[in-house]
Amino acid sequence: MPEPRPPAPNDIRLRKILDDTLLAPRWPEGFFMRGFEAADALALHALLTAVFDDGADGPFDQWWPRISGDADFDPALCFLVIDAKGRLAGAALCWTRAFVKDLAVHLDARGKGIAEALMRHAFAVFQARGAAHVDLKTNTVENAAAVRLYERLGMIEVDWAG
């Protein structure tokens, strides 16, 4: 599979080296993480559509076959955060090649540390799978707050060739 390429001038690729300095995730009070089940696909799509609001994923009936049929998709690498009312508050959808495809937190749940906990969980899972690093792509203009989070987590910019 080809490496991701920057679709926009302000897109960057960031990397976290997985070493012995990793910290365990801390889930905010009233939220818990659980694994993905096929029945969660519609809610995950709705969250991604609401958060990214760019229409890039398309309708569910096109998105889900594309995601679930991708060679890098593993449902065990999709982490969901649920709030006290049972609603999907956040998610990290990761590829098997230690790449965070999507990280999304519902607008009502932002500012509580959910994204940071999801990233720390993903780092730990990939480290346990033997990965040396975790990568992601983000946009420095549209996702300035996310870039600050990633930098705080120790991620550094790397070349697209990786």
Mark where each language-model region is.
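Conserved GNAT acetyl-CoA-binding A-motif
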Residues: 126-138
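Long, contiguous binding/interaction regions
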Residues: 21, 96, 157
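Acyl-donor-binding surface of acyltransferase catalytic domains
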Residues: 1-29, 162
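Hydrophobic adenine-recognition pocket in adenosine-nucleotide-binding enzymes
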Residues: 36, 103-105, 139
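Conserved beta-strand-loop-alpha-helix junction that forms the acyl-donor binding cleft
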Residues: 107, 136-146
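A conserved beta-strand-loop-helix scaffold within acyl/acetyltransferase catalytic domains
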Residues: 55-106
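A short beta-loop-alpha structural element at the N-terminal edge
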Residues: 32-46
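Conserved acetyl-CoA-binding loop-helix of GNAT-fold acetyltransferases
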Residues: 105, 111-128, 147-152
